[in-house]
Amino acid sequence: MEKQIKIALAGNPNCGKTTLFNALTGSNQFVGNWPGVTVEKKEGKLKKHDDVVIMDLPGIYSLSPYTLEEVVARNYLITERPDAILNIIDGTNLERNLYLTTQLTELGIPVVIAINMMDIVRKNGDEINVKELSRELGCEIIEISALKGDGVMDAAEAAIRAAKGTKTVPMHTFSGPVEHAIAHIEEAAVHSMPEEQQRWYAIKIFERDDKVLEKLTIPTETMNHIEEDIKAAETELDDDAESIITNERYIYIAQLIKGCYKKKSTEKLSTSDKIDKVVTNRWLGLPIFAVVMFLVYWVAMVGVGAPATDWANDGVFGDGWHLFTIGAADYEEATAEYDDQITRRD
């Protein structure tokens, strides 16, 4: 009898994970609750593959146990250790979804990524370089539309191949101080674990994850040495350990998106923005400034300035002033006669 293959579906809430689960299993699924909690548990057999079980994990944003759903999903992944993880990503919101991906690839379990809603991505005019993203993350990526059923069986077949192949090796690394501390933690606290699991546990110890520390019961002396490494990294990077890991994940994701994702520009530039774009150009700015200053000088000194100055000099303050005295003598004579008549009457 062939060994049963377990594939876990993992992804953010509302990424299309449950739609994909229904498409893969049809009516051949079982619904219940996870032991001890009210979180729904769904599993089923892959269509036409009785030896493949699909587990629909609760929607989560990370593997840090902040919510009940995250606790349930994480416990299943690190305890049951499925043969492969099919990570569903919303293609219209890569940055948020890839945060979980960076953690899943550290578990030492084969990971296949299914980028969902690719039909919407294309409709929006956006582009995802799937080949480059796959190379950077170190795992196979399949484009799907769970709602339309496009590519769903291709994603399942890729997960089956991954389950029978090699483990996913995380491609991203953290900064020097963090990697230095993680290496010491692996050597001091988790060296007896299977090699593919060591890095994830070391990162969680660096983050001071309470549930991991409680599970491992690391000797006090060893933990004191580890704390020295963690505090050294915190001092050098001026932040707490958990925030350091979070920030560096997002820095890595930003670099991924910059190289693999191209968003269609939908902004229409206003007239003033278009002018600004030209006049502030590093190559055109100075020539345009010189031309504008020349025009201002020409208008002031030649175009308007010279005629206006000539008119003022000749017409107002020069010989032209006599124009204003035309008829003045007659006016003065008439005024004098009028004054004489008034005097005689008196």
Regions found by a protein language model. Name each.
Residues 112, 122-265, 335-338:
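Alpha-helical transmembrane helix bundles of large polytopic membrane transport and channel proteins
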Residues 1-66, 79-80:
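Conserved G1/Walker A P-loop phosphate-binding module
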Residues 267, 279-289:
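Membrane-interface helix starts
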Residues 73, 261-278:
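Cytosolic juxtamembrane amphipathic/interface segments immediately preceding
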Residues 46-49, 72-141:
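Conserved C-terminal guanine-recognition region of P-loop GTPase G domains, centered on the G4
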Residues 288-299:
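Hydrophobic core segments of alpha-helical transmembrane domains in multi-pass membrane transport
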Residues 27, 36, 59-60, 91-95, ...:
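Conserved nucleotide-binding/hydrolysis micro-motifs of P-loop NTPases
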Residues 299-346:
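Interfacial/capping segments of alpha-helical transmembrane domains
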